Amino acid sequence: MSCQYQDGKVPKVVKENFNAKYPNENDPDWDIDKNDNFEASFKKDGVHYRADFSPNGNWIETENNIDKKDLPEVIQDIIDTKYEAYKIVEIEEVTHYQKGFFYDVEITKDGNKQDVEFLKSGAIIN
């Protein structure tokens, strides 16, 4: 759950670090997420991205939504077998400051949501 955040109230260090990481993206929309991190939404090369920064300006992660067909085939196969009874809610490509690049697949079954994080190889990391 996030709420619209006025750009004037985003800490200067957060804006500076966003601008350093994404120098050509000067007009993001800012939200604050459930963890009190600042989320910048912006478009780059026609793709919508969300970049999260802590209140002290540290970059946490950048993510964008993709379709199942855009997942590596090995991950599609795992979803089709191991999670065949689940419905896919959302799929994201994520680059995280600690975990590096991975795919976050949010699935649901009987009202219970869970995230499964995959490396490109298909290894599950959470």
Locate predicted features.
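A short, surface-exposed beta-strand/turn
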Residues: 49-60, 114-126
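Long, charged/polar, surface-exposed segments that mediate recognition or autoinhibition
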Residues: 58-85
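Flexible "stalk/tail and boundary" regions
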Residues: 5, 80-81, 86-96, 100-103, ...
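Exposed beta-strand-loop-beta-strand "reactive/processing" segments of non-cytosolic proteins
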Residues: 26-50, 99-115
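Post-signal peptide N-terminal segment of mature Sec-exported envelope proteins
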Residues: 12-28
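Bacterial Sec-dependent N-terminal signal peptides
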Residues: 1-10, 18
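Hydrophobic/anchoring residues in structured secondary elements
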Residues: 30-32, 64, 91-93
